[in-house]
Structures are given as C-alpha cells and as structure tokens.
C-alpha cells in the first residue's frame, strides 16, 4: 500500500479497497505551525483512540464523517475525500489569537458560538479569511459555506454536551471537511486535544496541546487523562 501523503501528525496510505484510505497517527507533536517540534512515544496511539471514540460518538448523533473504523492502536480506515482547504474554527470562550485580534479578555464567553475560516496554506501562515474570500478563491460555494457552518455548529453542540459530562469546558476547536466523489461534505481529519482547547470545568486546567505550547505540563499524561475520562462515558 502506497504512502500518499505525510503531514505533521499523520501518514495517509492507499488500500486494496477503492475509495478507502488508511490513516496512521504519528508520535510527533508540533506547535507554532511547526516551529516547535518533538517526538513523544504514545502520542499517535492516544490521538487515534480519542478521535475514533469522538467520531463514533458524533455518528450516533447524526454527524457524518470519513471515519469507518479503527484498525489498530495507531491506524484508522477512512473514506477517501478531497479535503477542503479550510480550517473551520468554532469558539465558545475567548482565548488565543482572538484575544489579540479583537481585544476580548481571556475567558470571555461568547453569547453564541463564533465560526471562523482559516485558509489552509503554510506559505501564508493559514490566514483568517471571510466568506467572500472563500468564494473568491473558489474553495467553496455559498451553499457549501452554509453547510460547513451548520455542520461545525452541530459538532460544537454535541461536543459541548460531551465535555460537560466529563466536567470539562470546550473552549474552541478546529475541524476540517472533505468532499466525496459525489460531492457530499463529510467531517474529516481528526478531533483530539491536538485540535481543541479544553479546560477543566472548575480549575481551568488545560486538557489540550496548550500544555505543550506553553510548557505547563506533560502532553502524554494530559492526553491519557482525557482518554480515560472519555472511556468512562462509553
């Protein structure tokens, strides 16, 4: 099976089944668009297991993704999609870049979830773009933009409730979507502490990659604790 693509966190391989791919999660962690990089044994296993559980949970709540099944500790079988070059970010609580861009205090709770689009382009450092930019760049049509926003908000609603049951708060997260050969839009990539900001409901302790970004704790211990909380709900 041929290696089709290798990114910061995953490798994508072909399979013997047409329209299906094998995803391997790597033991690498990056921050700052790759400026900070380390290898951590067990990280790929944790993110694969977390994403598999969350995608199955979302499927039970009517949200379709490319996920088919978990193959091994570090591998998934997924439906082949053409990735839409957007990071769709949903924010419930202000932190990170939006506090610098718009002056919100860290911890400010938005009245309604805020959806933002970032253009997936490493050379441009993944800039924030508007709906009009998305159409101008021919990334998605107006109706597809509305579909992306609706799906992102639906995912947020389900995940906020899930995190609440784990005594956690979903601060923000980013997701990616892809299109099948017949044009259907599916949730793709992953949902894990790599792609979310998650705070303890009572102490605001991080349960996400910010422990690595800010050198405030062990990423492996943090992700393991998160996975244990997730498995307790199964």
From Swiss-Prot:
Q: GO terms for biological process?
A: 'de novo' IMP biosynthetic process; cobalamin biosynthetic process
Query: Entry's InterPro entries?
Result: SAICAR_synt/ADE2_N, SAICAR_synt_PurC, SAICAR_synth, SAICAR_synthetase, SAICAR_synthetase_CS
Its recorded reaction(s) are: 5-amino-1-(5-phospho-D-ribosyl)imidazole-4-carboxylate + L-aspartate + ATP = (2S)-2-[5-amino-1-(5-phospho-beta-D-ribosyl)imidazole-4-carboxamido]succinate + ADP + phosphate + 2 H(+)
Question: Which EC class heads this enzyme's classification?
Answer: ligase
Q: Under the GO molecular function aspect, what terms does this record hold?
A: ATP binding; phosphoribosylaminoimidazolesuccinocarboxamide synthase activity
E.C. no: 6.3.2.6
Q: Keywords, A to Z?
A: ATP-binding, Ligase, Nucleotide-binding, Purine biosynthesis
The keyword Ligase belongs to this UniProt entry's keyword annotation: yes
> Mind telling me which Gene3D superfamilies this protein's record contains?
ATP-grasp fold, B domain, Phosphorylase Kinase, domain 1
Pathway listed: Purine metabolism; IMP biosynthesis via de novo pathway; 5-amino-1-(5-phospho-D-ribosyl)imidazole-4-carboxamide from 5-amino-1-(5-phospho-D-ribosyl)imidazole-4-carboxylate: step 1/2
Please state which protein family the record places this protein in.
Answer: Belongs to the SAICAR synthetase family.
User: By its UniProt entry, which NCBIfam families does this protein fall under?
Assistant: purC
Query: Under what name is this protein listed?
Result: Phosphoribosylaminoimidazole-succinocarboxamide synthase
Per the UniProt record, the source organism is Staphylococcus haemolyticus (strain JCSC1435)
Q: What is the lineage of its organism?
A: Bacteria, Bacillati, Bacillota, Bacilli, Bacillales
> What gene name does this entry carry?
purC
């Amino acid at each position: 099976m041929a290696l089709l693509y290798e990114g910061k966190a995953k490798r994508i391989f072909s399979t013997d089944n047409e329209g299906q791919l094998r995803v391997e999660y790597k033991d690498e962690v990056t921050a700052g668009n790759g400026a900070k990089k380390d290898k951590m044994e067990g990280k790929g296993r944790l993110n694969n297991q977390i994403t598999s559980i969350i995608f199955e949970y979302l499927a039970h709540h009517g949200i379709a993704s490319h996920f088919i099944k978990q193959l091994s500790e570090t591998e998934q079988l997924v439906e082949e999609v053409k990735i839409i070059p957007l990071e769709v970010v949903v924010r419930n609580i202000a932190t990170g870049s939006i506090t610098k861009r718009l002056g919100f205090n860290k911890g400010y709770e938005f009245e309604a979830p805020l959806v933002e689009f970032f253009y997936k382009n490493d050379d441009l450092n993944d800039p924030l773009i508007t709906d009009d930019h998305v159409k101008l760049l021919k990334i998605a049509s107006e109706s597809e933009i509305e579909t992306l926003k609706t799906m992102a908000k639906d995912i947020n609603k389900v995940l906020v409730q899930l995190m609440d049951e784990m005594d956690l708060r979903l601060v923000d997260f980013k997701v990616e979507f892809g299109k099948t050969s017949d044009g259907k839009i599916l949730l793709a990539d992953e949902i894990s502490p790599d792609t979310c900001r998650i705070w303890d409901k009572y102490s605001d302790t991080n349960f996400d990659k910010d422990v690595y970004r800010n050198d405030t704790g062990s990423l492996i211990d943090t992700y393991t604790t998160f996975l244990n909380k997730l498995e307790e709900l199964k």
